[in-house]
Amino acid sequence: ITFSKIYRSCKSDSDCGNQKCARGRCV
């Protein structure tokens, strides 16, 4: 399930590549 095209859902920073996981979203 994708909540937004900009903020991907995540469980950890590693799910976001060079971004960080914050409150379930990559920022």
UniProtKB/Swiss-Prot annotation:
Expressed by the venom gland. Its main location: secreted. GO terms for cellular component: extracellular region. Keywords: Secreted. It is found in: Secreted. Transmembrane segments: none annotated. The keyword Transmembrane does not apply. Not toxic to mice by intracerebroventricular injection. Belongs to the u18-CNTX family. This is U18-ctenitoxin-Co1a. It comes from Ctenus ornatus. The lineage of its organism: Eukaryota, Metazoa, Ecdysozoa, Arthropoda, Chelicerata.
